[in-house]
Amino acid sequence: SFILFTLHDFLLLNDNDDAPQKVFADVESRLDDLSANPLDQVGIPTGFSRYDFAIGGGLRKGTVNVIGARPKTGKTLFAENAGIYIAHKLGIPVLNLDTEMMLQDHQDRGIAMLTEVAINDIETGKFADNSYKNQKSRDVAKQVKDIPYYHKSIGGKPFEDQLSIMRRWLAKEVGLNAEGKANDCVIVYDYLKIMEAADVKGDLKEYQLLGFLMTSLHNFAIRYEVPVLAFVQLNRDGINKESTDTASGSDRIVWLCSNFSIYKSKSDEEIAKDGPENGNRKLVPVISRHGEGLADKDYININMIGKYGKIVEGQTAFELEDGTDYSEKLENGNDDIPFA
């Protein structure tokens, strides 16, 4: 037993992978690397600059960024707009995992968003009756034909199968480095829910199962250093409340996400106060591990143009009240930034 104990100790002493490290041992070389390779922001931009800033500089590697919304609010359009921006404007591969819509739905909405030809005209083929709409749709179709924007319908698939789909996509389309970490990419998960009876084990309640799904997604993001933009359904409290307990399976989701935001329709009073030109939706960053979030009762104005499947970010409510612009504040230093 003494020999076994000694051998065990020897193995532990030589297990460098699991050994704790001094936090600042190589900090000088890290500073050298950072100064030699400056970035505009740490994470991948979503196309919504105020949201990116509030959560800490876009979608960071190894994080799960969660947006909660009530049904039929437009969360799928938000996911589509962000995904197409990242793939089209930045050339970064995006995988859209969708639990409800088919590939053709994404094609129609994507073309409508990029051309501002109505979704209904695209879906019915009526765009071809108008020479301008027809030419614009054809031109855009050629432009986006090869962008790295991928879709997979995962409705009804067990979560283990979904993880396998993600792993295969990383290996085949994105690529892994020598350490097994993924190259730049984003996974959009729309949305976290229980798919089928096979996912239900024993007497576990739905919120517990959603917690397990979130844990698996979180571990996957860390394992491959992939940023995940995930959407969840808000419970009925989300109609009026704007807090972390509005998410179904909220505790585990909030514990493990990097940030949690609420996307919802604006009230008639808010539309009247902000002005109808400043949107019909609002995005409320509730918590953020890396970013500064927003001040209490502030929110980002969003205009959802459902006809075209388009989401446009506006100013925050406080910016409208103060007559300021956050980008000007950024240039003058962080002290005056209205996000606190």
Go through each PLM region and give its residues.
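Intrinsically disordered, low-complexity regions enriched in small/polar residues
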Residues: 4-14, 21, 26, 129, ...
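Glycine-rich nucleotide-phosphate-binding loops and adjacent flexible coil segments
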Residues: 48, 53-231, 237-239, 245
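C-terminal regions of RecA-like/P-loop NTPase motor modules
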Residues: 25, 116, 120-127, 141-144, ...
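A broad, low-specificity signal marking well-ordered, structured residues that form hydrophobic/aromatic
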Residues: 46-49, 65, 149, 283, ...
